[in-house]
């Protein structure tokens, strides 16, 4: 457990591709997807925040602080991140989505190592083929930069990354760690793969 790192699990989206069902609460292997994410990151961080814009009471049942976007317009992952950045007192904030049930057990360790090695402002995970834009470790002091970005009407997360010294943490040895579930079909495929 790191005393300098808190985490936010992003569960604030509209889940259009999941038929509007709240992805964090969709069951995979008999438990809500967010529970898989919690179990994976809990040993790696000090505190966990859950960013949710609906079903807040249900999310609170997991025993962690639930925060809703400061702006209620469903502005995407940056809105959840900026809200969490304003809530944490930690040196770093880990950001993960609620629909990645196979996150690495060494996620924080490797991301922090890469961030410090490059003296970067943030580190984003890569599965070896592509970067995972909502799996990152960042300094909460970047909040003002993110606020200015959002206030300018910007929403593309990678455009915001480009404004900062961004390290890339390589997880090509764990290519399935960032498999996420956006559709009922993907949920079924992942459930079958886990059961094997």
UniProtKB/Swiss-Prot annotation:
Top-level EC class: transferase
E.C. code: 2.7.7.77
Subcellular location field: Cytoplasm
Cofactor: Mg(2+)
Catalytic activity entry: Mo-molybdopterin + GTP + H(+) = Mo-molybdopterin guanine dinucleotide + diphosphate
One Gene Ontology term of the molecular function aspect: GTP binding
Residues involved in GTP binding: 10-12, 23, 51, 69, 99
UniProt keyword terms in alphabetical order: Cytoplasm, GTP-binding, Magnesium, Metal-binding, Molybdenum cofactor biosynthesis, Nucleotide-binding, Transferase
A GO cellular-component term linked to this record: cytoplasm
Keyword Nuclease carried by entry: no
Binding annotation for Mg(2+): 99
Residue ranges of coiled coil: none
Subunit structure: Monomer.
Family listed: Belongs to the MobA family.
Biological role stated in the UniProt entry: Transfers a GMP moiety from GTP to Mo-molybdopterin (Mo-MPT) cofactor (Moco or molybdenum cofactor) to form Mo-molybdopterin guanine dinucleotide (Mo-MGD) cofactor.
Listed NCBIfam families: molyb_mobA
The protein's name in its UniProt record: Molybdenum cofactor guanylyltransferase
Organism expressing this protein natively: Shewanella sediminis (strain HAW-EB3)
Organism taxonomic ancestry: Bacteria, Pseudomonadati, Pseudomonadota, Gammaproteobacteria, Alteromonadales
Gene name of the encoded protein: mobA
């Amino acid at each position: 457990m790191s005393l300098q790192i808190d985490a936010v699990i992003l569960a604030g989206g509209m889940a259009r591709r999941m038929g509007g069902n709240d992805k964090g609460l969709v069951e995979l292997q008999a438990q809500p997807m967010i529970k898989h994410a919690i179990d994976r990151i809990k040993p790696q961080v000090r505190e966990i925040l859950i960013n949710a814009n609906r079903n807040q009471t249900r999310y609170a049942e997991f025993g962690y602080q639930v925060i809703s976007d400061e702006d209620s317009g469903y502005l995407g992952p940056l809105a959840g991140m900026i809200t969490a950045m304003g809530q944490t007192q930690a040196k770093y904030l880990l950001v993960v989505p609620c629909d990645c049930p196979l996150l690495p057990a060494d996620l924080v360790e490797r991301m922090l190592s890469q961030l410090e090695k490059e003296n970067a402002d943030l580190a984003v995970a890569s599965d070896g083929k592509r970067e995972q834009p909502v799996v990152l470790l960042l300094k909460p002091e970047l909040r003002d930069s993110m606020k200015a970005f959002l206030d300018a009407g910007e929403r593309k997360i990678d455009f915001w990354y480009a404004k900062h010294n961004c390290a890339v943490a390589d997880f090509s040895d764990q290519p399935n760690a960032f498999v996420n579930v956006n559709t009922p079909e993907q949920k079924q495929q992942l459930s079958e793969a886990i059961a094997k």
